[in-house]
Amino acid sequence: MNSFKTIGIIGGGQLGQMMAIAAIYMGHKVITLDPTNDCPASRVSEVIVAPYDDVEALGQLAARCDVLTYEFENVDADGLDAVVSACQLPQGTDLLRISQNRIFEKNFLANKAGVTVAPYKVVTSSLDLEGLDLTKTYVLKTATGGYDGHGQKVIRSAEDLPEAQQLANSAQCVLEEFVNFDLEISVIVSGNGQDVAVFPVQENIHCNNILSKTIVPARISDQLADKAKKMAVQIAKKLQLSGTLCVEMFATADDIIVNEIAPRPHNSGHYSIEACDFSQFDTHILGVLGQPLPTIHLHAPAVMLNVLGQHVQQAIDYVAQNPSAHLHMYGKLEAKHNRKMGHVTLFAEDADEVEEF
């Protein structure tokens, strides 16, 4: 039996590209499905050019591959179910459906995985916003489709209600009580259907709702770090996870609150390529293939900086002046404002000395 596989990746962005690179290093072949022929993954894999919801193209990908995976959660789960056998998609479509809908996600996290989440309620129309205790702050989020701050409205006072009511009338939403947190953190976990590998706790700093800087290890107590890891592993085991998952959390002075999950490698885990003995992409490929997972070790404290479209030249200059920094550019042809173009990783004992772009 050939131990080298053909892996199909749905999505050819930077995550698909880095998954493909990890798979190729292990000796596997990669075919990617993406709507554009010049996507980042096209530099390292064959690409089937078709929309993500093209059932015929998904079927073609499935027919040519031993195993399928996806680089982002907005994939047509019904379309996948129609053409892919369960054994061919180890991550499954249940995880997709949970992570595509905040209502399903909150229910899973709170009631099935048994982890702490912010107090929330389901909102089906603006009527559900009547009688809010406006001494508290809330975040109204659409149940589906939101990313990088889109599809969200913070409610701090009555002045914010008209916009919130408009959002609530446009789509199903989740209303969360705002968490007064000290830090935003995340934990990457990878599973092979049985065992779970866990990465160090990451501290995340956002600018305009886009990740700007990740610091590893997160600057929280050992007790809170252990709790965050245990919660992430608890979620992974409840899911019988195959592949990599990111659990995004808030750290308060004495507790960890789970915010959301991403069923794939995550921007905040990119540091692991250089800073750990195995990256989140390595363990993702091992996980979806059902292979044994390593114990993850962090070589030294590290910082990752995102390179957005407006930062490209600044990042190139930075690496020229700091030759120990690792620059990753994803090969996107157009450097749009706030578009993720690459990242920089470097080892740093004092994260505050490393300024964001």
Language-model features: where?
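Short, conserved charged micro-motifs
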Residues: 128-131, 160-163, 312-317, 350-357
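Phosphate-binding core of ATP-grasp and ATP-grasp-like enzymes
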Residues: 167-220, 226-258, 262-270, 278, ...
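Short beta-strand-to-turn element immediately C-terminal to the catalytic PLP-Schiff-base lysine
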Residues: 123, 152-157, 188-192, 216-218, ...
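Generic C-terminus detector
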Residues: 329-357
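Short glycine-/aliphatic-rich beta-strand segments at the starts of folded cytosolic domains
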Residues: 297-308
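A conserved helix-loop-beta module that forms one wall/lid of the active-site cleft
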Residues: 91-153, 158
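ATP-binding N-terminal substructure of ATP-dependent carboxylate-amine bond-forming enzymes
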Residues: 1-100, 104-107
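Residue-level signal for inorganic ion chemistry
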Residues: 23, 68, 187, 284, ...
